[in-house]
Curated annotation (Swiss-Prot):
SS bonds (residue pairs): none
Binding site for Mg(2+): D39, D41
Lineage of producing organism: Bacteria, Bacillati, Bacillota, Bacilli, Bacillales
Organism, scientific name: Bacillus mycoides (strain KBAB4) (Bacillus weihenstephanensis)
Binding annotation for ATP: G26, R29, R110, D153, R156, R159, R162
Binding site for CTP: G26, R29, R110, D153, R156, R159, R162
Name of the protein: CCA-adding enzyme
Length: 397
């Protein structure tokens, strides 16, 4: 409750000005579940302009949705006016938002009952839709009719399955049936928004459960590059998923589990940045090499420590070893390398040209690569004179 106490002064100030105010959303849910608390959000009957008048330190980030960020005790908090939403456009966003003075009207528009619990600054729960009971049963249940909620915003179906993965809850039967019926509406949602939810699913503690629900509800058939992948997804559930340190590792493990042969093509369908695609593919390539042999100096040098660490963690998950010492061994081997990259070589292409009468050409790059590998393998000291003598001894100059 300590973090809520820090934010309670906002609620107290709003109430002093004649407004209602409550803690709402995921932070209240996580408090009940006894999970780490994320962002703390506040809902109030005060209109955005009234909130800004009360709190001089504010940022008007989403006034059209009623949201003002209030900075209190050095922390930012989203303060949002109670609101209802009109008909939704394209199954993803309301055509308009109406501010109201009723907490119940605000809570009834939310996605799942576990997320529709409010809490006073004293810690008293306002549970109008049996959210606490759903949490006790570990069930994900929509507020009101599931068909209505998913037709309003189709992304809620992905959120529901994401919560299966992150919380270890199960889908309430009518909620699950509605996902099976309305899964096709997910095709109206921007891929980027789906990717965010799927990534949270992959990094969840109960990821296997989430993947199983993707299959059972057939929602996978509306996801990029997974339309015909029921067997591949079921194969992925046979692996023991670990809590990876990075999302790159989670995606690499997933692609390995489903046997994806064209990872770059797959990831482009999910609208990833070129850098992230490059990292994930690099991890997969390193895993392929790692399966063939232990790390050696050349493989580790060419891979680089950042990719190598991720690849080793994923490899340990694949073989179900989970040996943390293996990553430390990779780190020790890398730190023992004479050089960590080509920029640390004490010779340049210009040096090579000055030592010979040859004209510039491809031979310069080839020679630098030979020198680089010799240094990395410990066959050559990284000193300019030693390098020149080595080249002369090998008749390479």
């Amino acid at each position: 409750m300590e973090r809520f106490k820090k934010a309670s002064s906002i609620i107290e100030m709003l109430k002093q000005h004649g407004h209602e105010a409550y803690f709402v959303g995921g932070s209240v849910r996580d408090l009940i579940i006894d999970r780490p608390i994320g962002d703390i959000d506040i809902a109030t009957s005060a209109l955005p302009e009234e909130v800004m008048a009360i709190f001089p330190r504010h940022v008007p980030v989403g006034l059209e949705h009623g949201t003002v960020i209030v900075v209190e005790n050095g922390e930012p908090y989203e303060v949002t006016t109670f609101r209802t939403e009109s008909e939704y456009e394209d199954f993803r966003r309301p055509s308009s938002v109406q501010f109201v003075r009723s907490l119940e009207e605000d809570l009834k528009r939310r996605d799942f009952t576990m997320n529709a619990i409010a809490m006073t600054e004293e810690g008293e729960m306002v549970d109008l839709f049996a959210g606490k009971e759903a949490i006790r049963l570990k069930e994900i249940t929509t507020v009101g009719d599931a068909a209505d909620r998913f037709q309003e915003d189709a992304l809620r179906m992905m959120r529901g399955i994401r919560f299966v993965s992150t919380l270890g809850f199960s889908l309430e039967i009518k909620t699950k049936q509605a996902i099976e019926t309305y899964g096709h509406l997910l095709e109206h949602i921007a891929i980027e928004r789906i990717t965010v939810e799927f990534e949270k699913l992959l990094t969840g503690t109960y990821c296997v459960n989430g993947l199983q629900e993707l299959v059972e509800t057939k929602l996978f058939s509306h996801l990029p590059y997974l339309q015909m992948s029921e067997e591949r997804l079921l194969k992925a559930t046979q692996y023991k998923w670990d809590s990876f340190e990075t999302d790159v590792e989670a995606w690499a493990f997933f692609l390995y589990c489903i046997g994806e042969e064209h990872p770059s093509v797959f990831l482009r369908q999910w609208k990833f940045s070129n850098k992230k695609i490059k990292d994930i593919v690099a991890v997969l390539l390193a895993i392929r090499s790692r399966k063939e042999k232990e790390w050696d100096t050349i493989l580790l040098y060419k891979t680089g420590i950042r990719i190598a660490e991720m690849a080793e963690r994923v490899y340990e998950a694949i073989i179900e070893s989970y040996n943390s010492a293996s990553v430390k061994q990779v780190q020790s081997l890398f730190h023992a390398l004479p050089i960590k990259n080509r920029q640390e070589m004490n010779v340049t292409g210009n040096d090579l040209l000055s030592w010979t009468d040859k004209k510039p050409g491809p031979w310069v790059a080839e020679m630098l690569q030979n020198i680089e590998e010799a240094i990395v393998q410990g066959d050559l000291v990284n000193k300019k004179e030693d390098i020149r003598e080595w080249l002369q001894r090998c008749n390479l100059l």
